[in-house]
Amino acid sequence: LIKKTPDYHITINMASVRCDGLESAASFADAYNFYPTDGMTLFQRSGDEYFRIMGGWDVTASPGVTAREGMDKLVPVENWRGYCSRSNFAAGATDGGSNAVAGYIFEKMNASAKEGVNDKGNSEGLNEVLYGFKAYKSYFILGDYMVALGAGVTNKRPELDGEIRTTIDQTAWTDEVFSMKREKMELVASGTHSLLSADGTPLWLVQKGKFAYRILPEYTREAFVTCETRPTDWVKRNKVNEKKQGLPSEARILRLWANHGQRPVDDTYGYVVYAGRQIPSDELPFRVLQNDTLVQAVCSMDGKVVEAVLYPGNKGLQAEGLSLSASAPCAVLIREEAGEIVVSVTDACMNAALKGIRIVLNGREIKVPMPQGMLCGKPAVIRVDRMTNQ
């Protein structure tokens, strides 16, 4: 899922079992492509927020990714199929405007382990730090806000070293960083700090000229920020860098993350990133309707935009003033405009036999035909009159 405006670029990358991941080629190119399709979420304004610091990245803290910490345990490999999720559930929906929704069930696997693979590389049996945990991850874009929700975060291998964490961002630290509450800003010093104030309320964390971050404390128990300078090893990341001169010996990094601990079972997280140029308000312009392993959903405060990820086994969404259900697992975006309801739906399992999905919104049935053939899995967008089904 990509949102691009003249001022910023947001990318969210997910790979279900239907897809392969990004290849690694330790002997001659990228050696650490372990996490790019694990829900990686990138926020860019100048375009160089990440590649200028890649040499010093903690790869296990890739932005947007839920993972076990342990950069020192990663072994570079050649893996021509990359990594994906064991689940067939992944979807994104948008009507082409300023809003979007995406979500997937994440439980990492090596794509080379699929049947019929004849180019496995040398990754089999290596890097157990990558595996053994699960999360339901969703993303909601409402204007200049990106909301991320997680549920069912469970460590299935708690005997392995390393806590489970969800990284909010790991980006270039290029300017002053402030914490903000009630529009009062305080400079954040280097080191590690909580993203909650002393009284337990959330703070906005703002990097001057870049993006603003805030956790949703009802879903996030612990979250931290660190401003740090790390040594780089560009050649270790990619052999091609042997031929490059003048690469920086250290990287200044701003990193934010939610911590799930060593033994999470059905843990959650929630955070928001503001990409606009204004000072973000303490009053958020949206509310979370549900965040669990059945439904993850958000709506705008005026109720004109509703976004939901409906997982297998769900019984629909019931919230104050709103009921929503679907006849198949999907991602749904509903937007009101000038006498119409714009409905965007994506089949999350890319079922080629599925001809349509029936949406029931506040008791009203809306039938949405699914794209067929080579367009299977594409968002379907329909417009209906607010008063009739025409």
Regions found by a protein language model. Give the residues of each.
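Extended polysaccharide-engagement surfaces of secreted carbohydrate-active enzymes
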Residues: 1-354, 360-365, 379, 387
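Solvent-exposed serine/threonine-rich low-complexity stretches and specific carbohydrate-binding patches
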Residues: 366-374
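Mature N-terminal, pre-catalytic/accessory segment of carbohydrate-active enzymes
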Residues: 384-390
